């Protein structure tokens, strides 16, 4: 399938089965997302995998009542921790006084997703 066909056939799923997702598939999805372009190869995001039903239900409430039947939630968070360590190793200041790193981390997280 070429890129145009892929984009034209996109659809959004809002109702999920409760069928468990094999760990191998979860790992493959995370590995595939990690191959997306990102800022300076720093991958300014973290992925939290939630599989416990009570935690999924709690997250559902925080996400304006989105369904909680899915067997897992992947929460992708903008995270500049790697950049913080990179600056420390090089003895340079961390320029968090601007929005560039927030935007970079947000774009990285979005591309991963």
Which residues does each predicted region cover?
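Acidic, surface-exposed loops and disordered segments
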Residues: 1-113
């Amino acid at each position: 399938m070429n890129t145009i066909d892929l984009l034209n056939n996109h659809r959004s799923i809002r109702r999920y089965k409760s069928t468990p997702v094999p760990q191998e598939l979860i790992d493959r999805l995370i590995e595939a997302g990690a191959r997306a372009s990102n800022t300076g190869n720093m991958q300014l995001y973290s992925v939290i995998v939630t599989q416990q039903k009570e935690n999924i239900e709690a997250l559902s409430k925080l996400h304006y009542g989105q369904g909680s039947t899915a067997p897992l939630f992947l929460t992708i968070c903008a995270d500049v921790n790697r950049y913080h360590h990179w600056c420390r190793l090089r003895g340079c200041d961390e320029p968090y006084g601007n929005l560039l790193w927030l935007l970079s981390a947000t774009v990285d997280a979005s591309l991963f997703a």
